[in-house]
Amino acid sequence: ADVPGNYPLDKDGNTYTCLELGENKDCQKVCKLHGVQYGYCYAFSCWCKEYLDDKDSV
């Protein structure tokens, strides 16, 4: 089953890029900014588990 989630967007409407795939401290911080406890780097963008609202840019 697919885990729900999404790519959060910054204030300019862009995804957060990342270089270190998988577990990524920067992405963890980004996801916590968006109110989600866990995230990782997938396809060079931060992806947040169970993050559904892609309109809540920070």
UniProtKB/Swiss-Prot annotation:
What cellular component terms from Gene Ontology apply here?
extracellular region
Q: What is this protein called?
A: Bestoxin
Predominantly, its location class is secreted
**Disulfide bridges in this chain:** C18-C41, C27-C46, C31-C48
Please name the GO terms that the record assigns under molecular function.
Answer: sodium channel inhibitor activity; toxin activity
Location of this chain's protein in the cell: Secreted
Q: Keywords assigned by UniProt? A: Disulfide bond, Ion channel impairing toxin, Neurotoxin, Secreted, Toxin, Voltage-gated sodium channel impairing toxin
Tissue specificity: Expressed by the venom gland.
The role this protein plays is: Beta toxins bind voltage-independently at site-4 of sodium channels (Nav) and shift the voltage of activation toward more negative potentials thereby affecting sodium channel activation and promoting spontaneous and repetitive firing. In mice, causes intense writhing.
Q: What is known of its domains?
A: Has the structural arrangement of an alpha-helix connected to antiparallel beta-sheets by disulfide bonds (CS-alpha/beta).
Q: Which CDD domains match?
A: neurotoxins_LC_scorpion
Give the protein family: Belongs to the long (3 C-C) scorpion toxin superfamily. Sodium channel inhibitor family. Beta subfamily.
Q: Where is the LCN-type CS-alpha/beta domain?
A: 3-58
